[in-house]
């Protein structure tokens, strides 16, 4: 294996072909990546991305890849697959997005975030690749393209047995769809989100997601939405691909406890299996079942190892109890909010408690509908809203007005997430649960605050 010299500081002498952005400074790798516009004006086509991979030696061609698309549940499916494969004894690379706190969260090897050393070395290699390709007339990679190349590089260097690859946006034109021979294509639940890019109907969005389906590659998909299922099945039949439609009829909840759900699954042969799902959200049962069927489709049916792996699955900000009675859920669209509310309401009813809510959202989401759903579903006591530290974040005044119009509970606005969290933690008592929801940016800020250990003893 080639040995590269590690330099934590990377010399950048590059004029990017994106707007008029010019950089000629010494920066760390993360600073360099952060200055790449997420939505480059000149994005590389899939054919061009293939050329980048060819220049890298086409590392993806020798990888066994699970390719995951969908609106909600992608990250959780990746986490279930990762946990099961690691427990079976395989070395696994996982590429997901977005990150909550640290950009390195997007790259995991055997369930652990890559080291700073690994991250910087890979960034340097991809930066040098980008410079070579620009000299040949290609555009500098977009933010997500750059991270995708880093993932392929890291997983190649780590000599992983399997790769779990989550799409960034959509499927058909997504950067990750450059891969040609995945083991299985997986499509999670589909709902209205990113409509400005993917279309304004379920059918249009499903068509974009179904773009990851490839000839000769089995597809496993969430079949609970009739409209989405029809589109996915049509595409699979067009390509003569075997498909496995999974829905709520394929499992039943046996019991629940403080850890999560015990569910009974049907495998593709109609045989029952009992699995423990460590989550307070029933929506994770469907994600676990999708993962189970995908492993079957890949010929990896070591049931005992899968069961143990699933029972150890961890995925942040999905009905995550970060301290007793305090839950984080990254739901950020109406369908995700509905799944969250189903789980939160069951917790309130089971524990006979009311709910305190911290809510924030970004401006390009259907925040008004999400707020109405929250206000009309949960037995609310306190509602705290705050502006998240993002250009896309809604102003506190807008959030406050929206909640006040539909909610009779005590609604308070705060200038920061930390102030809102501090208020709820100071005011909480044994009769209420605290739920934080509405945006993954919000989850990241809360986790950053909690990391400072300011709230020990509350």
Residue ranges and their predicted role:
Residues 4, 13-70, 77-90, 95, ...:
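Short functional linear segments
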Residues 10, 134-136, 158-166, 182-274, ...:
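Acidic, Mg2+-coordinating active-site environments of NTP-dependent enzymes
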Residues 53, 58-61, 87-180, 196-198, ...:
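ATP-dependent carboxylate-amine ligase catalytic core
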Residues 158-161, 352, 429-431:
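Short, high-confidence coil segments that cap the C-terminus of an alpha-helix
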Residues 162-165, 173-186, 190-194, 204, ...:
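Nucleotide phosphate-binding/pyrophosphate-handling subdomain across enzymes
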Residues 222-223, 237-257, 276-282, 305-313, ...:
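Beta-strand->loop->alpha-helix junctions that form or flank phosphate-binding loops
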Residues 225-240, 327, 371-433:
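C-terminal helical cap/extension that packs against the catalytic core
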Residues 439:
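Active-site-proximal loop/hinge segments that shape catalytic or ion-binding/gating pockets
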């Amino acid at each position: 294996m080639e040995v590269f010299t590690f330099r934590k500081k990377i010399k950048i002498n590059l004029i990017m072909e994106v707007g008029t952005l010019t950089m000629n400074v010494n920066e760390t790798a993360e600073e360099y990546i952060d200055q790449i516009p997420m939505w480059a004006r000149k994005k590389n086509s899939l054919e061009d991305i293939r050329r980048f991979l060819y220049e890298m030696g086409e590392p993806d061609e020798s990888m066994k890849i699970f390719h995951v698309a969908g609106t909600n549940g992608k990250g959780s499916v990746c986490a279930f697959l990762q946990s099961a494969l690691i427990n079976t004894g395989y070395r696994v690379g996982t590429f997901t997005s977005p990150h909550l706190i640290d950009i390195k969260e997007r790259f995991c090897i055997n369930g652990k975030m890559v080291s700073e050393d690994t991250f910087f070395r890979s960034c340097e290699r991809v930066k040098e690749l980008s410079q070579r390709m620009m000299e040949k007339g290609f555009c500098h990679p977009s933010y997500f393209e750059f991270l995708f190349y880093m993932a392929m590089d890291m997983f190649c260097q780590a000599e992983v047995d399997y790769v779990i690859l989550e799409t960034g946006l959509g499927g058909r034109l997504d950067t990750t769809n450059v891969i040609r021979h995945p083991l299985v294509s997986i499509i999670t639940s589909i709902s209205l989100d990113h409509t400005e890019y993917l279309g304004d109907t379920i059918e249009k969005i499903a068509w974009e997601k179904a773009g990851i389906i490839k000839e000769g590659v089995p597809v496993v998909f969430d079949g609970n939405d009739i409209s989405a299922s029809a589109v996915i099945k049509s595409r699979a039949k067009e390509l003569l691909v075997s498909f496995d439609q999974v829905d709520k009829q394929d499992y039943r909840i046996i019991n629940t406890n403080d850890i999560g759900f015990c569910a009974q699954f049907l495998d593709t042969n109609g045989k029952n299996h009992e699995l423990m799902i460590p989550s307070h959200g029933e929506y994770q049962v469907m994600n676990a079942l999708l993962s189970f069927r995908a492993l079957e489709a890949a010929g990896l049916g070591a049931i005992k190892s899968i069961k143990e792996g699933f029972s150890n699955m961890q995925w942040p900000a999905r009905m995550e109890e970060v301290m007793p009675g305090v839950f984080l859920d990254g739901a950020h669209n109406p369908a995700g909010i509905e799944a969250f509310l189903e789980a939160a309401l069951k917790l309130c009813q089971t524990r006979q408690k009311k709910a305190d809510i911290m809510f924030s959202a970004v401006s390009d989401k259907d925040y008004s509908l999400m707020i109405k759903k929250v206000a009309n579903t949960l037995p609310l006591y306190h509602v705290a809203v705050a502006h998240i530290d993002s250009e896309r974040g809604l102003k506190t005044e807008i959030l406050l007005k929206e909640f006040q119009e539909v909610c009779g509970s005590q609604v308070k606005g705060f200038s920061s997430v930390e102030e809102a969290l501090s208020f709820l933690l100071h005011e909480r008592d044994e009769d209420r649960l605290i739920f934080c929801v509405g945006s993954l940016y919000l989850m990241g800020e809360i986790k950053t605050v909690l990391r400072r250990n300011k709230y020990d003893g509350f």
